[in-house]
Amino acid sequence: MIKVGIVGGTGYTGVELLRLLARHPEVELKAITSRKEAGMPVADMFPNLRGRVGLAFSTPEEAGLETCDVVFFATPNGVAMQQTRALLDAGVKVIDLAADFRIKDVAEWQKWYKMEHACPDLVDEAVYGLPEINRDKIKAARLIANPGCYPTAVQLGFLPLLEAGVAETGTLIADAKSGVSGAGRKAETHILFAEAADNFKAYAVGGHRHWPEIKQGLEIFAGGPVGFTFVPHLTPLIRGIHATLYARVSADVDLQALYEKRYTDEAFVDVMPAGACPETRSVRGANVCRIAVHRQQGSDMVIVLSVIDNLVKGAAGQAVQNMNILFGLAEDTALSDVGMLP
């Protein structure tokens, strides 16, 4: 059994990790930490886990994380980097669901996240945990940087075009929408029911923290610089990301065949039939990115529609997928749920 610890188990990604890991046949949950809620039974906070998780929250110091095989950080940005080195030195593998190790340019990371990086030497070692790109590197990793939610949907949507070299790379555009759970489990005015319901708005138009992460990936796929515009929006949904992506193609190519071939062996990427429009509810609760590709009115403009559940393929599900790869398990272990309808 894989001994698992979770640091920061009281947020939405933390409880989603617990939901998935509680029924994982190869996992033994050893510790779930929260300084504020130490001593509280996990099931008292999250009744959906009654009968599934018998642990209580503990402080990180009391959790015995160094005895785990792998520790997940479902914490705010800046927490994992303070504790990762000690865990790695103890032989523990680390999967960080925050952004501490995603961006390879440490100065760029510090600019966007407004803090000094505590272990910049580990950034180079960290493997970016997008399995559809880095599966082989994940297998040998000690430290995995789990991708962000927007970056997962956008990168998987653009990947086939850029790998094949058929898209003009100077004007890539991502128009993306997220449910309010993407903002985390905290009290902030803009995600209150009375503010978010019956409303739809753009935010961070001048610059979002996921922009450098996405751009970094797109430039790797393209093999050179890209021009990339990213505009996120907040929608009155709880879960879900819908990314509408725009690119001009420089060649006459069968786009449907291109996408189907690229993802034919990927269990968690579903390329829909030509003309389809994926819906966020079709991936609710599922570790799936559902994609459709269109060429608009016979022009050179390609429109890619990409949907994920921000808490599953955009966070906890992808983290479990990475763990499965890391420990040589079937990739879909504990991740076979279909989307919930209605």
Curated annotation (Swiss-Prot):
Q: Name one Pfam family in it.
A: Semialdhyde_dhC_1
GO CC term (a single one): cytoplasm
- Keyword set, alphabetical order: Amino-acid biosynthesis, Arginine biosynthesis, Cytoplasm, NADP, Oxidoreductase
InterPro entries recorded for this chain?
AGPR_AS, AGPR_type-1, NAD(P)-bd_dom_sf, NAGSA_dehydrogenase, Semialdehyde_DH_NAD-bd
Reactions performed catalytically: N-acetyl-L-glutamate 5-semialdehyde + phosphate + NADP(+) = N-acetyl-L-glutamyl 5-phosphate + NADPH + H(+)
Which pathway does UniProt place it in? Amino-acid biosynthesis; L-arginine biosynthesis; N(2)-acetyl-L-ornithine from L-glutamate: step 3/4
> Which compartments does it reside in?
Cytoplasm
* Protein EC: 1.2.1.38
Predominant location category? cytoplasm
Q: Where is the active site?
A: C149
Top EC class for this record = oxidoreductase
Among the GO molecular function terms of this UniProt record, one is: NAD binding
**Which biological process terms from the Gene Ontology are attached to this UniProt entry?**
L-arginine biosynthetic process
State the similarity comment: Belongs to the NAGSA dehydrogenase family. Type 1 subfamily.
Please give the HAMAP family that the UniProt record associates with this protein.
Answer: ArgC_type1
Its annotated function is as follows: Catalyzes the NADPH-dependent reduction of N-acetyl-5-glutamyl phosphate to yield N-acetyl-L-glutamate 5-semialdehyde.
The record's PANTHER family line, in alphabetical order, gives: N-ACETYL-GAMMA-GLUTAMYL-PHOSPHATE REDUCTASE, CHLOROPLASTIC-RELATED, N-ACETYL-GAMMA-GLUTAMYL-PHOSPHATE REDUCTASE, CHLOROPLASTIC-RELATED-RELATED
Name of the protein described by the UniProt record: N-acetyl-gamma-glutamyl-phosphate reductase
